[in-house]
Amino acid sequence: IVAIKDHINLTGNNPLIGKNLDEFGPRFPDMTEVYNLKFRALAKEISKEYFEYKEGVYAWFTGPTYETPSEVNFAKTIGADLVGMSTVPEAIVAKHSGIDVTAFSLVTNLAAGISDSPLSHEEVIEIADKTSKTFQNFMRSFLGQINLAI
């Protein structure tokens, strides 16, 4: 389980493309701190009871295929610690709307080129199932105390 501290959008897409709705947020929102620092500090403290806390930069790919070894290498070269197919568009929209954001990524497999084993969706599901109870308990505790960070 890794707390996301920043992201890199490698999709060539952005959920804010199109007409801006000013009532939701500015045309060009600041993305300096998408992932709330106070929330991450709280998560770090609470995680001590559940798992070793780690933070990382998440690179967003479109999917639905797993990334190639070259894509993973490129992401690593430009500063990414994790790769995946989710999270970033929701974080962008939330930040645009003035919502404080925190995000966690469950690392379910070693990306292509890191391991000699072929990637398997079944393995991803299996690891997610094994970790789900720990993550649920952590999130209950985190959400129960989040008002302390606001």
Sequence positions of predicted segments:
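Glycine-rich phosphate- or other oxyanion-binding loops that anchor nucleotides, phosphorylated ligands
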Residues: 1-118, 122-150
